[in-house]
């Protein structure tokens, strides 16, 4: 359940621990699955800020590509 995963990650992120970037990345993925693009991007950005080599960088770029594709389609109708 995506909602439950987000709630669990919210709790985990209240603590300080090594590898916190991975939790932000996972929460970003959960938000992406809900098509909550802004929250997904925010969480990917947090992960990238903590770890520039995080896979969140690729995920961030993918979401931006998706959003840019949809916005272009809006103007071409």
Regions inferred by a protein language model and the residue ranges of each:
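Structural marker of alpha-solenoid helical repeat scaffolds
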Residues: 15-16, 49-50
